[in-house]
Amino acid sequence: NLNIIAYNNLSVTHTGNVVETVVRSFQIPTTEINTNSVIEILAQFGSSGGAFTKTLRVYFNTSNTLVGATLIGTQQSSATQFYGGFRRQIVNKNSINTNRIIPSAAVQVTDITNLTVNMANLNWNFSGTTWLIATIQLGNAAASATLENIQVKLSKP
């Protein structure tokens, strides 16, 4: 049973400063998430100018702010031109608030390609309010990067 529970395909580009900047945020409807659900976050992120570092970060929080937010995953590139997919799976382990994930510090494009680290405890409580917050940070103000879309899928037994 697979459902898209949150989705936004409005492209948003960040340029002009090196400050981590929120480019997308929305509340995830958590009423369908159960004790053995798999929550999958997918996004497309890219850039077409400058060999500077561009970083996409995805967070969860109980409110629409970065203050106190939990980092879910990071994608980073210094290529002059790139376009890639971001993917993280969160696996609930017989509980709504005991879950596992590839460590958030892993900078690989997706958790499929990341074979060199162990799973980590996330322990996010999906019984409460959950905001997904996506940010872009540039290594140089002359760079630019675009979040093309982001979605949350839910798979449950």
Give names to the regions the model predicted:
Residues L2-P157:
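Surface-exposed molecular-recognition determinants
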